[in-house]
């Protein structure tokens, strides 16, 4: 931080910043946009390492498995490993394990990459079949969305199956000339069709996203700062979890 910037900070803010040991970094729209790395990202991450501040990647985007996210980061020139990643797929898995420990079969409205993450955790992905009844319905950001599967998800929602959404984002940031309809818009579609909202939405601003970081790395809430681009998800997560942001 420059001397001029330091002079503009209040004593209270300086004290809070002095406690920060770890950054929880959003990904889409924060360190990259679509397939484009922001020009400041590499230097920013290097500066944090030099300052002794660790970081992890905390994303509401469940469309990629952790393995596929690591491949993307590597292609962008960012060094990361599995321990650096916490996605809403992982948050949904943790939630289901905690709240529905007997659940084995899930209807997953999500990408093939996301589905592999759930299968890796030991779950069975139900088919688009009225006789293949799931224990839990999971609705996510599905870039491979098929109309029949959206209808099937709506059917299970109408039947009272436990219903978990991965994130409330209405659209996903992109560097392309299009609108990427995200999970929050898909759950609204299901709500209009069935009258039912998700039982829980595990992504930011849900505080459990940051609590997973506290537990994984052993930090206190006041030692973690949330960095992101969206007020209604990223910025709101920090106070919900007692962190800085």
Task: Annotate the PLM regions.
Residues 1-27, 31-245:
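HAD-like aspartate-dependent phosphatase fold
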């Amino acid at each position: 931080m420059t001397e001029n910037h330091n002079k503009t900070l209040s004593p209270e803010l300086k004290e809070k910043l002095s406690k920060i040991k770890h950054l929880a970094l959003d990904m889409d729209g924060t360190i990259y946009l679509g397939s484009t790395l922001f020009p400041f990202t590499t230097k920013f991450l290097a500066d944090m390492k030099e300052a002794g501040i660790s970081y992890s990647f905390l994303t509401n985007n469940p469309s990629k498995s952790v393995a596929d996210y690591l491949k993307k980061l590597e292609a962008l020139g960012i060094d990361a490993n599995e321990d650096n990643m916490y996605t809403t797929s992982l948050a949904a898995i943790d939630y289901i394990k905690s709240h529905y420990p007997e659940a084995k079969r899930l209807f997953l409205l999500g990408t093939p990459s996301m589905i592999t993450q759930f299968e890796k955790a030991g779950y069975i992905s139900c088919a688009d079949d009225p006789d293949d009844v799931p224990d839990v319905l999971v609705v996510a950001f599905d870039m491979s969305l098929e109309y029949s599967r959206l209808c099937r998800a709506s059917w299970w929602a109408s039947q009272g199956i436990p219903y978990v959404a991965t994130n409330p984002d209405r659209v996903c940031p992109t560097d392309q000339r299009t609108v990427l309809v995200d999970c929050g818009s898909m759950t609204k579609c299901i709500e209009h069709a069935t009258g039912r909202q998700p039982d829980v939405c595990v992504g930011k601003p849900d505080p459990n996203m940051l609590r997973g970081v506290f537990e994984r790395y052993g930090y206190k809430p006041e030692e973690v700062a949330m960095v992101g681009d969206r007020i209604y998800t990223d910025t709101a997560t920090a106070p919900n979890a007692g962190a800085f942001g």
